[in-house]
Curated annotation (Swiss-Prot):
Assembly notes: Monomer.
Gene (name only): tuf1
Region described as G2: 60-64
Species this protein is from: Magnetococcus marinus (strain ATCC BAA-1437 / JCM 17883 / MC-1)
Protein name as annotated: Elongation factor Tu
Function: GTP hydrolase that promotes the GTP-dependent binding of aminoacyl-tRNA to the A-site of ribosomes during protein biosynthesis.
Keywords: Cytoplasm, Elongation factor, GTP-binding, Hydrolase, Magnesium, Metal-binding, Nucleotide-binding, Protein biosynthesis
CDD domains in the cross-refs: EF_Tu (cd01884), EFTU_II (cd03697), EFTU_III (cd03707)
GO cellular component: cytosol
Binding of Mg(2+), residues: T26
EC supergroup of this enzyme: hydrolase
Length: 396
């Protein structure tokens, strides 16, 4: 039989398993691939294939991540699983593996543990839109009341971090039994129920094309007789010739008109997400625009200087700092295409930050940058990356 061509007919969603160490994230990941493989919708990946994930470097940070893929009736999923807790922290903060939703794995035998809490907080801070809970190892708990107590505890914990704890689907099962092929309510059935819940509850991501136009400006040129051209890769949305666009960040916002879009020396009617283009701007002087600003649909994004961030500070081994830093530390924050100096304030009760820590901090930049929740940045000192972060909340 000929190999089937991979048909992109189903919507694509990125998900991942999160939760405390040894609660069964990797076993569950393997079990999902096994159950889906039985239906001809995945390639089975054994536990040790997933657990021995190779190291990858993302923005200078070493992260181990395993990627598996599978399909349900409705969707195609790319699923990430990380071997170690530090890998999760780095992954979620750098956005190395984008998550449209997560499966929170909690051992019914232990209940929520410190990393359960930390992963929920991280998911909230970095803007993972939805979570589904898999209450694992139910074969180790005989008492039905105890199971209900653990479920209540998980729901309350989710609610305390602003997830809708009462509405989130909680599926009870045993990843190990499913992996062993046991056709029982806690085995294979539980995996099928889990995937139904993921299909139903985790929203389909909005495609970049359908979002408001935004393009980080990488370069500015003057073309004699035609005006100023800014170049960059369109991050999202569409820009059409004749439309108004705003130049945002660093200086005061200016609204102008796009009078031309060029790609590979050809003139186009429009540019769209993913295209590397030159955009011709009406009546804009070359010195009015600079790298680090963005071109965007008017009123779709605002410039800000003050925000809360969730960040990870590199270890010495990763090429980061060798020493801790304190409040009022002034590094550069690299957003999209440029560095902006900022001052950071540590949370109350935190004296200093050591290399390898992850921390919530308040940052004030010396110049405004077009930003919104979820925007990633690097923390740099003299061109060397010392950390990574994500905007958790815009303050001003």
């Amino acid at each position: 039989m000929a190999k089937e061509k991979f048909a992109r007919t189903k919507p694509h969603v990125n998900i991942g398993t999160i939760g405390h160490v040894d609660h069964g994230k990797t076993t569950l990941t393997a079990a999902i691939t096994k159950v889906m493989a039985a239906a001809g919708r995945a390639e089975f990946r054994a536990y040790d294939q997933i657990d021995g994930a190779p190291e990858e470097r993302e923005r200078g940070i070493t992260i181990s991540t395993a990627h598996v893929e599978y399909e349900t009736e409705a969707r195609h999923y790319a699923h990430v699983d990380c071997p170690g807790h530090a890998d999760y922290v780095k992954n979620m903060i750098t956005g190395a593996a984008q998550m449209d939703g997560g499966i929170l794995v909690v051992s019914a035998a232990d209940g929520p543990m410190p990393q359960t809490r930390e992963h929920i907080l991280l998911a909230r801070q970095v803007g993972v839109p939805a979570l589904v809970v898999f209450l694992n190892k139910v074969d180790q708990v005989d008492d039905e009341e105890l199971l209900e107590l653990v479920e209540m505890e998980v729901r309350e914990l989710l609610s305390s971090y602003d997830f809708p704890g009462d509405d989130i689907p909680v599926i009870k099962g045993s990843a190990l039994k499913a992996l062993e092929g046991e056709e029982s309510e806690m085995g294979v059935d539980a995996i099928n129920r889990l995937m139904d819940a993921v299909d139903a509850y985790i929203p389909e991501p909005e495609r970049p094309l359908d979002q408001a136009f935004l393009m980080p400006i990488e370069d500015v040129f003057t073309i004699s007789g035609r005006g100023t051209v800014v170049t960059g890769r369109i991050e999202r949305g569409i820009v059409k010739v004749g439309e108004q666009v705003a130049i945002i960040g660093i200086k005061d916002t200016v609204v102008t008109t796009c009078t031309g879009v060029e790609m590979f020396r050809k003139l186009l009617d429009q540019g769209q997400a993913g295209d590397n283009v030159g955009v011709l701007l009406r009546g804009t002087k070359r010195e009015d625009v600079q790298r680090g600003q963005v071109l965007a649909a008017p009123n779709s994004i605002k410039p800000h200087t003050k925000f809360n961030a969730e960040s990870y500070i590199l270890t010495k081994e990763e090429g980061g700092r060798h020493t801790p830093f304190f409040s009022n530390y002034r590094p550069q924050f690299y957003f999209r295409t440029t560095d902006v100096t900022g001052v950071l304030k540590l949370p109350e009760g935190v004296e200093m930050v050591m290399p390898g820590d992850n921390i919530t901090m308040e940052v004030e930049l010396i110049a405004p940058i077009a930003m919104e929740k979820g925007l990633r940045f690097a923390i740099r000192e003299g061109g060397r990356t010392v950390g990574a972060g994500v905007v958790a909340e815009v303050i001003d």
